[in-house]
Amino acid sequence: MDRNEIFEKIMRLEMNVNQLSKETSELKALAVELVEENVALQLENDNLKKVLGNDEPTTIDTANSKPAKAVKKPLPSKDNLAILYGEGFHICKGELFGKHRHGEDCLFCLEVLSD
C-alpha cells in the first residue's frame, strides 16, 4: 500500500466519522424534542385529570364497583422542576443542579422530568 492509498483511506474514514457525527447530533436533537414533548403532554394530561376529577359527578354504584386502585397524584414539585427547566436551569441530580444551561438541552434533566 502506498502513501496515496493510505491517504485516501484516511480521508474516507474522516468523511464517514463526520457523517456519523452529524447523524448522531440529529438523533440527539430528535430525542430531546420527543422527551420534551412527552413531558409537556404528561403535565397537560395530569392537569386535565385534576380538572376532570374535580368536575365529574360522584355517581358510583357501590354494588358493582371494584375496589379503587391507589391513584398516584402528580407532585407539584415536578411542575416546579419543569418550570425551572423551562427557564433554562439544570434540574438533574449532581453538581449541575441549579446551574444555567445556556440554551442547551440536557438529557439528564429531561430524564428527571419524564420519571
UniProtKB/Swiss-Prot annotation:
Homotetramer. Interacts with both DnaA and DnaN, acting as a bridge between these two proteins. Its cofactor is Zn(2+). Binds 1 zinc ion per subunit. Transmembrane segments: none annotated. It is found in: Cytoplasm, Nucleoid. Belongs to the YabA family. The keyword DNA-binding does not apply. GO terms for cellular component: nucleoid. Keywords: Cytoplasm, DNA replication, DNA replication inhibitor, Metal-binding, Zinc. The gene is yabA. This is Replication initiation control protein YabA. GO terms for biological process: DNA replication. The keyword Zinc applies. Involved in control of chromosome replication initiation. Inhibits the cooperative binding of DnaA to the oriC region, thus negatively regulating initiation of chromosome replication. Inhibits the ability of DnaA-ATP to form a helix on DNA; does not disassemble preformed DnaA-DNA helices. Decreases the residence time of DnaA on the chromosome at its binding sites (oriC, replication forks and promoter-binding sites). Tethers DnaA to the replication machinery via the DNA polymerase beta sliding clamp subunit (dnaN). It comes from the Bacteria. Zn(2+) binds at residues 90, 92, 106, 109.
